[in-house]
Amino acid sequence: MNKKAFTLIELLATLTILGIIMLVAVPNTVSLFEKNKKDAFISDAKRLVALAEAEIRNDESIDVSYGGFIVFSFSYLDDGSFESDPDNKPYDSANSFVVVYKRGNATSYQFDYYVQLIGSKRGLDLTLSKGIEPSNVVEAPKKQTITNAIKTVFNIASPTIVNY
């Protein structure tokens, strides 16, 4: 007998096998996309910090007292390279910024860089730049104002802030 079609059993077996493959492959693919979006978000946060570091190094008019804070707004630092967040929506420029904290004294001081970056679906609450990791990216960021974020992180009632 010359068969030119599949039997119902063969079709059901094939569909079952494809269904099992989909159950395994789809969640892995989705988690891979999420991981890539978080990595891109972290990359943007680090780039924002790098722009603030360059601004501190290159602009001698920027000065802050020891124990004081310089805040660079997202809008100030954006050189046009931040077209959109990893979800293809604009960053929340009103709630995204870099805080530079000058610690030490006249003979020995250091700048610590903190970043808060808020996107459309995820965000990074004010975090020390050295500790930025994908695990810091949250789905529902706090969207704190500059003053509240500094008060929360540094436990200071009324911080001295210089805005740029």
Enumerate the language-model features and the residues they cover.
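Aliphatic-rich helix starts adjacent to a transmembrane/signal segment
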Residues: 19, 28-49
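Short, surface-exposed interaction loops/tails
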Residues: 101-164
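Extracellular/periplasmic head regions of type IV pilus-like filament subunits
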Residues: 60-123
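N-terminal alpha-helical signal peptides/signal-anchor transmembrane segments
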Residues: 44-63
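N-terminal single-pass transmembrane signal-anchor helix
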Residues: 2-29
